[in-house]
Structures are given as C-alpha cells and as structure tokens.
C-alpha cells in the first residue's frame, strides 16, 4: 500500500513542499527567515481577524474602539500588541531575509526574487494602511503626508490624491477604504507567498557557498522542520518579550492622542521600519525627486541580479564584496536613525550623504568590487 502522503492530491503538494523536499545539507540559520515570515503572516492574519471583530472604521469611533479593545475585550490588549509588534517582527525577518538573498546571491533565481520584491511592496503598503487605522495623531498625519506625495506626479497628481482620499482631505472615506485594503492585502500576500515558494521549488534552495548542491541533498523533514521550530520558538520569545514587557517601545507616543486635523505634531514620522526610505525621501529638496528616490530605493532590488558581475554566486569567498555589503548594512542603519531625527543641521547633510551612499554602493561599488575580485582571481 502506497503512503497517502505521497498519493493524495492535496497531501502530495504539502509533502513535496515541506516533508520530502530535497534540501541542501549546509544551509545556515539565515535560511530560517522564510519560514519565520510565514509564521509572522499567519500570526498577523489571526490577530488581525480578532481585532477586526471589535474595530470600527469610522473617524468618530475608530480611536475609542481601539481603546475599547485594550480595556474591555477579553485579552484584547495582548491581541492588539501582538498585532502591532508582530508587524515589527515581520519587518525584521523581511530585512534579514532580503539581506541573506543579497549576501549569498539568491537573487539569481529571477522569478523568486522579483515576486519577493512585489511581496515587500505589498507588505509595506499593508503596514502603512494598518498604521492609519487607530486614528491617532501620527496615523492621521502620516496618512496625510504619505498620500500627499502622489500629488508630485505631473498632471494627474492632485486628482489622484483626491481620488485615494475620497474627498478633499484624509477623512471618513479614507479610513474606511484603508481598513478594507488592510483586511484584503494579507490574503493577497499569502497567495503571492505560495507563488514565491512555487518558483523556489522549481530551482531548489541556494546554499551559503553558492555552489550547486544537487549531489548533496537531505530531506526537509526532520532536519529542517526541527530547525524551523527552534527559529519559531526564538521569534515568539522575542515577540512576547516585546508584547509583555515593552509593548510601546517601537510605537509613537503621539498615536495615543486622537487625530486632530487642526493640530500638526512637531515631528511627523512613520514606523521605524519605514524610516530608511523616509530619510531618502527627505534628503532630496525637490518633491518629485524625493518621491522617485523613495520608490527607487525599493525597486533598485529588481536591478541587483543584472548588476551581478562576479564569477561566483555567493559572497562567502569574496572579502571585498563582504566589506561592501556590511557598509550597505551600516548605511541603512544610519538612514533609519536619520529618518527619526528632525530636519535640521547636521541631520540633513548626514541623510543626504547616506542616501547617495546607498545608491552608490548598490549601483557602482558592489559591481566594481566583484570585477576587482574576478581580476584578483585571474578569472
């Protein structure tokens, strides 16, 4: 009798993806973040579903409905803070996952990489719209500032912004549609994640050496299932430490003040995971230029596979490229810090230099480093 796991139409898909999947024997903990992202997504959908049962997407009651969730709903506070801090964990895993892809040359799987970039954009859109829903000061002004950026688009800009707002300012219509989109997008992300996985399983996983590992594969279960469970336990540990001991560490105190269109907060800034892009946006004095730089700061990832000049796939044996990679990581941390600072000297010039460095490293310095390494190896 054949195993039902290998014959049943549905079980067969699960089996080939998570049980009998041939996996490189040497993939490190950097390969854990894919499964952690899946866990984050499931966690966000579940906590979000329970929050949506009590939330009202009306400007008059949105803020008080969130207060009601925290004060009156059974374990509402933990659901709310798991959702808010779950988003932070999601982005930490995302950045680690992308960093792994850049370091080990995983971007040469073109379809997988490009769907990953689309997933990043969709997740950023979802997180932005979710931040608007509590209808605090930073929710309102963040929504106003970020949607207003579209007015920089020539000719159609103003009409486009008013169309998104559903009126002449961020108001009831905006909040309602943001709630609708915030609810539907995670399911689109889940579908895209399945396509992401589908394309990955066409080629098989990369590994730290960047050398094809067809001659040395092991089954995913039990080796990597147990490894993923360890990763998941660590993820949940960090998340629960945040939720139970410092739930507001990564939030903005301004969001505990109800939205007031007549009172602008002194420093409008998004959540920490958008600060690097926000710093790039602010570092260009021209509005349209800033918006283009903001969009390109993410879309530049689609160019990375075409800028790969090295004869080796991974950076494991390329010290100069490794140096460039870690300079890029430090530059992104600098941009994140600058994004949270007021627009004044010396932060302006630091932000401008860090923004130039960001594009310079990816577009010029990394390909140049690869070429130098090729020549040093006489390839």
Curated annotation (Swiss-Prot):
PROSITE patterns associated with the record: CYTB_CTER (PS51003), CYTB_NTER (PS51002)
Keywords: Electron transport, Heme, Iron, Membrane, Metal-binding, Mitochondrion, Mitochondrion inner membrane, Respiratory chain, Transmembrane, Transmembrane helix, Transport, Ubiquinone
Location of the protein in the cell: Mitochondrion inner membrane
Keyword Nucleus on entry: no
Residues annotated to bind heme b b566: 97, 196
Cofactor(s) annotated in UniProt: heme b
Description of how the protein assembles with itself and partners: The cytochrome bc1 complex contains 11 subunits: 3 respiratory subunits (MT-CYB, CYC1 and UQCRFS1), 2 core proteins (UQCRC1 and UQCRC2) and 6 low-molecular weight proteins (UQCRH/QCR6, UQCRB/QCR7, UQCRQ/QCR8, UQCR10/QCR9, UQCR11/QCR10 and a cleavage product of UQCRFS1). This cytochrome bc1 complex then forms a dimer.
Miscellaneous notes: Heme 1 (or BL or b562) is low-potential and absorbs at about 562 nm, and heme 2 (or BH or b566) is high-potential and absorbs at about 566 nm.
UniProt name for this protein: Cytochrome b
Encoding gene (name): MT-CYB
């Amino acid at each position: 009798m054949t195993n039902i796991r290998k014959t049943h139409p549905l079980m067969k898909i699960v089996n080939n993806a998570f049980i009998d999947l041939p996996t490189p024997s040497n993939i490190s903990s950097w390969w854990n973040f894919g499964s952690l992202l899946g866990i984050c997504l499931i966690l966000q959908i579940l906590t979000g579903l329970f929050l949506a049962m009590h939330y009202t997407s009306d400007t008059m009651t949105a803020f008080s409905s969130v207060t009601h969730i925290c004060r009156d709903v059974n374990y509402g506070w933990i659901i709310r803070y798991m959702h808010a801090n779950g988003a932070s964990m999601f982005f930490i895993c995302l950045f680690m996952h992308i960093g792994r892809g850049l370091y080990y040359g995983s971007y040469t799987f073109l379809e997988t990489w490009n769907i990953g970039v689309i997933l990043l954009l969709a997740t950023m859109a979802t997180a932005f719209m979710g931040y608007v829903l509590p209808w605090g000061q930073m929710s309102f002004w963040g929504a106003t500032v970020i949607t207003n950026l579209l007015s920089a688009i020539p000719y159609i800009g103003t009409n486009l912004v008013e169309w998104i707002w559903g009126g002449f300012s961020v108001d009831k219509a905006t909040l309602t549609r943001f709630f609708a989109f915030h609810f539907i997008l995670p399911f689109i992300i889940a579908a895209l994640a399945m396509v992401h996985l589908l394309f990955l399983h066409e080629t098989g996983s990369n590994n730290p050496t960047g050398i094809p590992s067809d001659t040395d594969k092991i089954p995913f279960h039990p080796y990597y299932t147990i490894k993923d469970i360890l990763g998941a336990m660590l993820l949940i540990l960090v998340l629960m430490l945040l939720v139970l001991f410092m739930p507001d560490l990564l939030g903005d105190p301004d969001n505990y003040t109800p939205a007031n269109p007549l009172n602008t907060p002194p420093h409008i800034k998004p959540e920490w995971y958008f600060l690097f892009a926000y710093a790039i946006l602010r570092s260009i004095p021209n509005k349209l230029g800033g918006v283009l730089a903001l969009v390109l700061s993410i879309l530049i990832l689609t160019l990375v596979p075409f800028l790969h000049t090295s004869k080796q796939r991974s950076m494991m044996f390329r010290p100069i490229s490794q140096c460039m990679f870690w300079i890029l990581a430090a530059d992104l941390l600098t941009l994140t810090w600058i994004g949270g600072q007021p627009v004044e000297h010396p932060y302006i010039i630091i932000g401008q230099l860090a923004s130039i460095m960001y594009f310079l490293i990816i577009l010029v310095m990394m390909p140049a480093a690869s070429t130098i390494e090729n020549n040093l190896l006489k390839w």
